[in-house]
Structure formats: structure tokens, C-alpha cells
């Protein structure tokens, strides 16, 4: 009974509003609430054997890019707080009998309220929306209170855990909270509170705490809920208060949101939750990454590979074997890839292998948590399905944003009797991946091209598809290398010439871009758009004679287009 939370209570009674309700006080004034930061290059490609599934996957990718991708990632601050009359229940924390909405736990609490009340409250979503709108409006002009007293040096620090056996949840939600103690000279004990049976706890939880926070040696404890404190230090992820915050605090974020969010209530509408979780990075996560990279400085990790495929230690994980894994690795091995099981490496080795990695390949799983430690040079390649594209792709986006690596997904088929049928995710969970020979070929062509070893391809369509993939992930140089490998084919194909021009444009090489555009025009003189692009590129290269030639061709072959272009761009008349 002590561990039970009554989710039938009204939101105004159930949830703590830090701007209004007693129980939570900031230990320090936050330097910021949120701020924009560079986003990672995140891409997805369809790699199913079935056209029907590929179309579905492409639709999901398009939807994610157009309706849920912000123009910048958002860093949300995490701050130390003092909680009064704190109760750790399940994977949540209460202060003075109200649930604290903090970080991922806060998101789960909102979901839990919806599930618990969907049969009894016809308007459960509207009720939540009204609650948050009232909070936000009522909090305008207010501040979350600061702790003003002298803090007892022995006061403990406590962290809520989803569990202590899932690597992803522990690292990204719980362990990172310890970073808010940096610079505080904290002297008390630290408690991770979790709901699972003690025997289910995995060794990595203690191992990572010891490896990354050696200053707390002997003071870190794992204790099952329920647990009560009269007063305790904890972490408050300010993203948890996003929907309760004064509108003036959040409004500026809308300029980074896609139109689909701006036009449906903005970033403070509950409908934006999924997109926010994909685009927001907690400052504690960035601090954990910085601490991890500092921990490996000056150590020798030369025994670790820079190109590797990550498999699973099936004794410890929920086994999801991928059809085609052995064949894929046989091909990867020929190009210097090694087989790695993260669980067999120490915490510092796991950090180092990612920090120094050139390329990691694996299938969907908690191992992608280690993307947090990757370098900006690292290509992290995940093999998933239409299911992961729909339900799980966004889980790892914040880790890519944090590390600035290049996160690439190939969505293949489901390992099921009928891969054309997408099973119910809630009842059947994630179905393992099945890679067809075609998918293996697509992935390998991509991988080896990034390594500068270009395959010989038979059709312009296949060359074009691969070159577009390379360009999309930031591999313009490799895309040019691929097109040069097929230069005889490319010279006769306007689309391939234009692709090469796009690559040179991406690399800011306007003279080479102009050469490629000239080839594109020769390959297909019926495209007026190529001539217009030649004019713009020649202007950038300061080649007036080329501008005059292109204008002449435009006037002769496409007089209406010529007249429209000249009337809209007065500068052209001075060149002509």
C-alpha cells in the first residue's frame, strides 16, 4: 500500500506545481532554463525487401523530418533541488504527497494518468491540457522558490530509477543526475531508488557509478522503494515543468519548432510531447558525456577497434537475434570490422571505443545508449524495422544531439511469418529484424563507400540512390568518389551530374559545381532549371561570360522562363 499512487485524483491534486505548491526548492539559481544547441545529422533509409513496406517506412521518415524535427536541438537545464517530505514510490518521487514531474519520469507519469483514467474520463486529454494551461497562465510572473536555509552537510541525495537492469534508462535518466552535484562539495550519501527485485539489478549500475564518480566511493547505495525522507537533495529536470512553466519562459522555443507544432498550439501543447522528447537534451546528459570523456583522457585504449559490429551477450539481454546478422558481419569483417559485445568491456572501455570510433554498426537495442560517448567523426549505423521507425527511432535522437555524431538508420524487415503485417506494438512488443540479401547489399555499399572503397554498380538508379544516401549523411566527398568511379555512366546522365553539383555545393566548391552543372546541361538540354542554376553559380564564381552564355541559351530555348527570370532579377541586366 505504501508504494501505491492514486492516479484517479484530479491533476491539480496529483501533480506538484513547483511555482505554487510547497515541497520543492531550487538549491541554486539556474544559469538558464533552456537554450538552443546544434543538432546532430540524423538520417533514415528504407531497406525492406518489399515495396509496400518501403513506402510505409519512407512515409514515417518524411513525417519525422517534416512534423517533429526542430531546426535546432534544445538543451534543457537540470538543477539540484531540496525536496520536503519526499516519498520515492515505484519509479516516481513525491514531495508533500504530490508527484514531481521531472525528466523522463514526468513523461511516464503523464502517460500513466492517461491510461489509468481513459475508461472513466471521456475527456482525459482535455482535462490534462486544461490543467497545464491553467498552471502555465497562473505561473506567469512567478519563480520556483530558492532554498534559503543552511543545508545539513549530512543530507542525502536521492535519485529515482525506472529500474536497475535496463542500461538505457539507467544511464540516460538516473546516473546522469549525479552531475548536478558537480562543484557543490557534497558530503552526504547517495541513494538510487528502484522498483525491481534486488536480484534483477545488473552489475553495470554500480560499475558505472564507481568508474565515473570515484569521488563518491563508499557513499553510493542502491535501495529498493518505497523510501521516505523528511528532507532530501535530488535533481529537477526543468523539462518536467515545461507544460507548467510561464508562457514567457517557453515562447521563444516555438521559432525552432516545425510548422506542424507551431500551428497546433505550439511547443507547450501536450501534442508536442513526442517531438520534444526527440529534440531535447538534458544538461545533465551533456555533463555526463563530458565527465566520461575526461575519465578516459591519458589512458591507452589502442587495443580497441575503430570499426566494429556490436552483438549481444545473450546471457544478459532480452535475446533479439537478427536474421542476416552472420552474413552481414562476414562482409563487414572483410573491411576490417571486429565483433564487439559491450557487456564484455569495462565502463571506461565502452566509453573509449565509442569516443574513438570511426563506425559502429548494430541492430536496435540498448547498446545505442553508448552513442552518447561517440565523437563528431563517428558514423553510428542502426539496423531496425518499420516498427522501430514508428515507435523507437526518436529514443536515441537526444544521444546523437549530445555527441554530434552522425546517426544513420536502415529500416529493414520484420522477422515474422508475414513481414507485410505490422504487429500491435503494445501487445506484441518489438519484433526482431530480418535483413534480406538486398538489404545487406544496400548497407554494405553504403558502409564501404563511406570508407572510400566504392562498389561497381550496374545502373544509374542504384548509383543515384547510394550517392544521395552518402550526401544526406554528410559524405559529399565520398558521393563524389562514387560518381567519379562511374564517370562514364554519369556523363550521360543529367541526374547524376546534378547530384555531383549538389555535392560540390555542399562542400562549398562553386567552380567544381559549375563544371558539373555544365555536364548536366549537355546530358539533358531540355531542363531550363539547369540553366538558371548555372547563372547563379557563375555569378558566385564571377564568370560573366558564362552568365551571358546561359542567358542566351535560356532566351533561345525557353523564352518565357528567360523573361520571367530577367524581370525578377534586375542584376542580370547589368551582366547581359
Predicted regions and their residues:
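Eukaryotic alpha-helical solenoid repeat scaffolds
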Residues: 558-576
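Short coil turns that delineate tetratricopeptide repeat
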Residues: 491, 525, 556-562
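Canonical positions in the second alpha-helix
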Residues: 485-486, 519-520, 553-554
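The feature primarily captures lumenal catalytic ectodomains
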Residues: 1-475, 492-506, 526-542, 568-571
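Alpha-helical solenoid repeat scaffolds, predominantly canonical TPR units
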Residues: 482, 516, 549-550
Amino acid at each position: 500500500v505504501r508504494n501505491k499512487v492514486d492516479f484517479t485524483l484530479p491533476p491539480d491534486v496529483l501533480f506538484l506545481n513547483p511555482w505554487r505548491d510547497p515541497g520543492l526548492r531550487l538549491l541554486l539559481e539556474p544559469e538558464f532554463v533552456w537554450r538552443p544547441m546544434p543538432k546532430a545529422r540524423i538520417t533514415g533509409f528504407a531497406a525492406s525487401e518489399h515495396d509496400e513496406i518501403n513506402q510505409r517506412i519512407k512515409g514515417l521518415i518524411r513525417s519525422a523530418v517534416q512534423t517533429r524535427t526542430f531546426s535546432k536541438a534544445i538543451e534543457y537545464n537540470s538543477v539540484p533541488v531540496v525536496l520536503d517530505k519526499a516519498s520515492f514510490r515505484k519509479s516516481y518521487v513525491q514531495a508533500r504527497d504530490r508527484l514531481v514531474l521531472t525528466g523522463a519520469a514526468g513523461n511516464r507519469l503523464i502517460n500513466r494518468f492517461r491510461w489509468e483514467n481513459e475508461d472513466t474520463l471521456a475527456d482525459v486529454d482535455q482535462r490534462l491540457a486544461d490543467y497545464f494551461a491553467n498552471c502555465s497562465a497562473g505561473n506567469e510572473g512567478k519563480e520556483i522558490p530558492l532554498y534559503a536555509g543552511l543545508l545539513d552537510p549530512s543530507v542525502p541525495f536521492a535519485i529515482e530509477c525506472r529500474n536497475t537492469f535496463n542500461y538505457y534508462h539507467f544511464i540516460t535518466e538516473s546516473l546522469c543526475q549525479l552531475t548536478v552535484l558537480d562543484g557543490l562539495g557534497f558530503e552526504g550519501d547517495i541513494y538510487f531508488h528502484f522498483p525491481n527485485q534486488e536480484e534483477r539489478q545488473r552489475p553495470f549500475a554500480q560499475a558505472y557509478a564507481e568508474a565515473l564518480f570515484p569521488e563518491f566511493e563508499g557513499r553510493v547505495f542502491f535501495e529498493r522503494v518505497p523510501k521516505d525522507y523528511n528532507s532530501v537533495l535530488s535533481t529537477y529536470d526543468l523539462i518536467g515543468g515545461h507544460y507548467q512553466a510561464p508562457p514567457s519562459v517557453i515562447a521563444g522555443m516555438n521559432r525552432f519548432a516545425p510548422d506542424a507544432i507551431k500551428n497546433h498550439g505550439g511547443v507547450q501543447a501536450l501534442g508536442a510531447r513526442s517531438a520534444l522528447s526527440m529534440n531535447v537534451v538534458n544538461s545533465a546528459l551533456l555533463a555526463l558525456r563530458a565527465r566520461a570523456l575526461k575519465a578516459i583522457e591519458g589512458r591507452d585504449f589502442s587495443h580497441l577497434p575503430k570499426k566494429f559490429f556490436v552483438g549481444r551477450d545473450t546471457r544478459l539481454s532480452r535475446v533479439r537475434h537478427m536474421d542476416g546478422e552472420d552474413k552481414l558481419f562476414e562482409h563487414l569483417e572483410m573491411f576490417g570490422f571486429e565483433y564487439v559485445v559491450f557487456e564484455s568491456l569495462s565502463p571506461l572501455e565502452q566509453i573509449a571505443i565509442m569516443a574513438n570510433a570511426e563506425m559502429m554498426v548494430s541492430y536496435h537495442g540498448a547498446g545505442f545508449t553508448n552513442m552518447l560517448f561517440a565523437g563528431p567523426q563517428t558514423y553510428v549505423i542502426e539496423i531496425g524495422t518499420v516498427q522501430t521507425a514508428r515507435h523507437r527511432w526518436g529514443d536515441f535522437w537526444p544521444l546523437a544531439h549530445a555527441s554530434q555524431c552522425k546517426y544513420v538508420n536502415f529500416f529493414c524487415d520484420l522477422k515474422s511469418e508475414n513481414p507485410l503485417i505490422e504487429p500491435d506494438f503494445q501487445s506484441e512488443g518489438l519484433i526482431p529484424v530480418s535483413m534480406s540479401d538486398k538489404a545487406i547489399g544496400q548497407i554494405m555499399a553504403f558502409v564501404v563507400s563511406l570508407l572510400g572503397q566504392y562498389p561497381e554498380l550496374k545502373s544509374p538508379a542504384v548509383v543515384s540512390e547510394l550517392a544521395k544516401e552518402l550526401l544526406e549523411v554528410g559524405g559529399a566527398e565520398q558521393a563524389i568518389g562514387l560518381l567519379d568511379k562511374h564517370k562514364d555512366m554519369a556523363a550521360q546522365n543529367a541526374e547524376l551530374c546534378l547530384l555531383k553539383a549538389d555535392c560540390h555545393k555542399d562542400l562549398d566548391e562553386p567552380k567544381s559545381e559549375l563544371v558539373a552543372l555544365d555536364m548536366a546541361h549537355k546530358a539533358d538540354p531540355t531542363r531550363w532549371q539547369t540553366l538558371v542554376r548555372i547563372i547563379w553559380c557563375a555569378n558566385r564564381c564571377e564568370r560573366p561570360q558564362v552568365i551571358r552564355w546561359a542567358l542566351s541559351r535560356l532566351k533561345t530555348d525557353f523564352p518565357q522562363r528567360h523573361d520571367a527570370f530577367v524581370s525578377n532579377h534586375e542584376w542580370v541586366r547589368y551582366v547581359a
